[in-house]
Regions:
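N-terminal auxiliary segments of SAM/dcSAM-dependent transferases
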Residues: 1-51
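Class I SAM-dependent methyltransferase Rossmann-like catalytic core
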Residues: 54-80, 87
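Conserved SAM-binding loop of SAM-dependent methyltransferases across substrates and taxa
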Residues: 103-116
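Conserved SAM/SAH-binding beta-strand->alpha-helix loop
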Residues: 126
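S-adenosyl-L-methionine
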Residues: 134-164
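A short SAM/SAH-binding and catalytic strip from SAM-dependent methyltransferases
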Residues: 169-183
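Conserved beta-strand signature within the Rossmann-like core of class I S-adenosyl-L-methionine
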Residues: 197-206
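C-terminal lobe and adjacent flexible extensions of AdoMet/dcAdoMet transferase-like proteins
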Residues: 265-389
Length: 389
């Protein structure tokens, strides 16, 4: 897959290596087979009782969270945060409120990409999981050296956490809106009044069709409450994957940064993680300052004989771009033979891309020339994410 191939050369951020060392101290020399059993047990718990509370008071559940789910979720958050960095989403944000923080995986992923954040508030209803987060964050020397302050609270959305400095505060919801009644609670949270509103909101959800499509429906709720969608959407029109498809949903794909014990742990599991997917929304009260028009790649490359076709988003319609590398003149045919786009890639719009329209009403396809493919490739380089170390 293009996304994974393009990003496999990325090294893990230094903060992740520090987290890995801290987790090793907590986990000790656990038996990989027992760890795998704990992961499967927790996974089955969520499948059989999706609305039940997480059993963090159980040692086996905490072990599964720290050894398996935490590394995956901090990688997802890091990928999403880098999409935001690409657009300047975090500029002026100094305080991060992490609702349903768990062990702080979402916060760590964002801090790895955005070291400018000065303060973190971890909020969760579980004292057990916050105790684990406290232990983990206490062992992250780089946060202390950078002067980043953090605290843990057992407050919830219903208790009305109010940002001390709303104009420089971000509310993070990572894998919490899947819980029962969470969407209704989130809508009430948004309607508290401007004086209590967070400047920025980041939502990460599972990349299933149901969760992804439900998250996209929250776009309109955010827009109605005076937020601007920064990513992944490139426009404020209706979502084409909701309006013109019965099954498509918007999600991104990122590489996982995995700890040293992962290979032995994953050997005992049926699920493998060569790449990670996540659905997300980034919104701010402030409108994006970049007035340029962007196109977002929303599908993996489809190789259809000698044609490459990919789903893109630039407005309210479901659209594809396509090209035939074998039909290009030399040397373009050779240079572009293996070129395709990664899910989530962003490139600058140009009216010339849309002059050769093909396809059906619910899936317009636009055929690109070799010069237009070169132009898109150059745009990718111009807008490339430069991950923080």
């Amino acid at each position: 897959m293009a996304q994974v191939r393009n990003l496999l050369n990325l090294e893990p951020p230094s903060l992740f290596l520090e987290v890995e060392s801290a987790l090793r101290n907590v986990l000790g020399t656990a038996d990989p087979a027992k760890q795998a059993d704990s992961v499967l047990r927790l996974s089955n718990h969520y499948v059989s009782s999706p609305d039940a509370l997480s059993p963090w008071q159980k040692a086996w559940a905490m072990n599964a969270l720290l050894s398996y789910y935490h590394p995956l979720n901090q990688s997802r958050a890091y990928g999403v945060a880098n999409r935001g960095v690409q657009l300047g989403f975090f500029e002026g944000i100094e305080t991060l409120y992490d609702f349903g923080a768990g062990t702080g995986a979402g916060t760590i992923g964002i801090l790895a990409a955005c070291p400018e954040i000065r303060k973190v508030i971890l909020s969760d209803h579980s004292t057990e999981v916050l105790k684990a987060a406290n232990s983990l964050f206490s062992n992250l020397r780089s946060l202390k050296d950078a002067g980043i302050k953090w605290e843990a609270r057992t407050e919830t959305l219903e208790e009305g956490i109010v940002p001390v400095a709303p104009s420089s505060s971000l509310a993070l919801f990572s894998y919490v809106l899947t819980e029962a009644n969470a969407i209704d609670r989130f809508e009430r949270f948004l309607k508290r009044g401007n004086q209590h509103s967070f400047e920025a909101i980041a939502i990460l959800e599972p990349s299933t069709s149901a969760d992804g499509r439900r998250l996209q429906r929250l776009r309109s709720v955010l827009l109605e409450n005076d937020y601007h969608i920064w990513a992944p959407c490139t426009h404020a029109d209706k979502c084409p994957l909701l309006e013109e498809s019965d099954r498509d949903w918007c999600h991104d794909r990122f590489p996982p940064f995995l700890p040293v014990w992962w290979k032995n742990l994953e050997a005992g599991l049926p699920m493998k993680n060569q790449s990670l997917t996540v659905s997300y929304l980034l919104a701010r009260k402030k409108a994006p300052s970049d007035s340029r028009k962007f196109v977002r790649v929303t599908g993996d490359p489809l190789h259809e004989k000698t044609k490459i076709r990919q789903l893109i988003c630039r407005g309210p319609h479901r659209e594809f771009i396509s090209w035939f590398p074998s039909r290009f003149e030399k040397p373009a045919a050779k240079e572009l033979k293996d070129f395709d786009l990664a899910r989530g890639d962003l490139f600058l719009d140009d009216q010339r891309f849309w002059k050769d329209q093909r396809g059906a009403e619910r899936g317009h396809e636009y055929r690109l020339t070799e010069n237009e493919v070169y132009q898109i490739r150059a745009s990718l380089d111009e807008l490339a994410i430069k991950p923080s170390r």
